Amino acid sequence: MHMPFIIDAHLDLSMNALEWNRDLRQPLKEINRREIGMTDKPDRGNATISFEELRKGNVGLVVATQIGRYVGPDNPLTGWHSPEQAWAQTQGQLAWYKAMEEEGQMAMIRDKKALEAHLALWKDGEPADKKPIGYVLSIEGADSFITVNHVEMAYAYGLRAVGPAHYGPGRYANGTDSTGHLNAMGKELLRTMDRLGMI
């Protein structure tokens, strides 16, 4: 039976790898076995994603996230105490994606040409078990952009999608369970994204 090509439009791969310490190159059974008895995070031992599982499901393209939340002094949520710390976290996540590219596990999709080449590879009739998972790099919440100029830096390294807000009060816009709107920095962020052709 022919499986359709599937795109996952939001996948926290680097967070799974770095915050949850999951080696996504391993089979799912092994990832979950290594978490037996762990209680530091909810759902330990219940991982659902690995590169092998993505390939089995013919999920050949994902919108892969970076995330680094900044929280102000009066914000009770968890997060970094400075945008610089949040930026550093996203750069560590980027380094993980690059390491997976070097291993042939992933392939960054920066433009239409790369997308078309990647789709052709996945539709060539060959088994998917050794094919790289394509990814469009996104960021979940813009809090880690120290300045709007950091959006341009991020675009240069391959970031193509930005969610200005994530959860709670944000530096550029307020997210889930908070009220408000795009502030002046948020509007400048959107203008920069528009100029760069980002989504």
Which role does the model predict for each range below?
Residues 1-184, 188:
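N-terminal hydrophobic targeting/anchoring segments and the immediately downstream early-domain regions
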Residues 189-199:
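Substrate-binding cleft of carbohydrate-active enzyme catalytic domains
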